[in-house]
Amino acid sequence: GSATGTLRVITRDGRIEGGEAPAPARLNVLDGSGHPAVPSSGYAQFEGQNGRVFFYSPGVVELSVPAGPVLVGAVRGLDTPEVSETVEVRAGEVTEVEILLESVWDPKSAGFLSGDHHFHLNYGGPFGLDPEDLPLMMRGENLDVATPLLANLHTRFEDQKLWGWEKADGLPLIRFGQEVRSHFLGHVALLDTRTLFWPWIWGPGYQVYGSDDRPNSDPLGHARSQGGIGGYVHPVRDADPFSPENVASPPALLVVD
């Protein structure tokens, strides 16, 4: 096999102790042949839109990689442009690279928190995540608030046992929400409710509740009655919602609600 060396990646953020302290980040590492490299432990992910394999670093991480050139890409949320560095890893040695990430804007200094209100902790696949896995990911994305949504996968009601779990002991903050799917009427997210809405799904083609006839105002009203927030998720199909092909893509009840 190929000779290998150890790559140590240190990421820093100019907003954290002036860039002196290591900062969590999302990393994408490619060896000289273009193959992704990941740590020996932890959770690696595949991002299908751009074809990247990535993982989250707490600020300092080591990887075993083939000797030779290695490309390291690092980013920390939407307000931090990606920084890429190519380093020459020597066989049998530890090669260190430091990456300083500079933000284009500091939301906290302007009085804002960053958040992600539509994602699912588990949604099929062989690897199950626990809520405790989220803080590292959130810090790597510079996220302050997250509301992972419970949702169905066909007739499976994913992560229902986690309803009520929350992290409220300081940033990042995490509380579970719910995605309700009413087929062509549009999917809605319910945030900060005290009870789950039932049913989670209905409408033509679903394996259960296929003949139910109810508007999305029912789950939205459920959220409002409990002091929560309801809204439509992914109301358009892609990044160009105003293209002629997407004229008919908004869900049927979006405008009505």
Task: Annotate each predicted stretch with a short phrase.
Residues G1, V87-K108:
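Extracellular beta-sheet/turn segments enriched in Thr/Pro/Gly and aliphatic residues
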Residues G5-G19, L27-V29, V70, I99:
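A short, amphipathic beta-strand motif
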Residues D13-R15, R76-L78, S103:
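Surface-exposed loop/turn motifs at beta-strand-loop junctions within extracellular Ig-like
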Residues R15-Q45:
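Short, ordered, surface-exposed loop/turn motifs in non-cytosolic proteins
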Residues G51-V53, A67-G77, M138:
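A short, solvent-exposed beta-strand micro-motif common in secreted/extracellular proteins
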Residues F55-S57, E62-S64, L78-E96:
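Structured interaction patches on ligand/partner-binding surfaces of diverse proteins
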Residues F112-D257:
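Catalytic cores of extracellular degradative/oxidative enzymes
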